[in-house]
């Protein structure tokens, strides 16, 4: 898992739109995935951003804890 996420604004026909991006594994490759949230002026789009960010950080935290446990399990006994 490549950790990384963010927000980008794309202008379409003169209007700004919000997109949340993150990395995903697809077919053994890491790709940057964009999720449309809505108009940059929309309060609902801002709420969707907060929800997407919280969900992503939760998944990333689970993956990091799993990796930590794997690494610690490989330590030789004291």
Question: Model-flagged regions — what are they?
Answer:
Residues 1-78:
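Conserved glycine(s) in the ABC-transporter nucleotide-binding domain "signature"
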């Amino acid at each position: 898992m490549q950790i990384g996420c963010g927000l980008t604004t794309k202008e379409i026909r003169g209007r700004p739109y919000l997109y949340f991006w993150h990395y995903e594994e697809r077919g053994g490759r890491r790709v940057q995935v964009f999720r449309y949230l809505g108009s940059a002026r929309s309060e609902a789009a801002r709420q969707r951003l907060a929800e997407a960010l919280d969900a992503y950080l939760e998944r990333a935290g689970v993956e990091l804890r799993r990796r930590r446990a794997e690494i610690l399990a490989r330590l030789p006994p004291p």
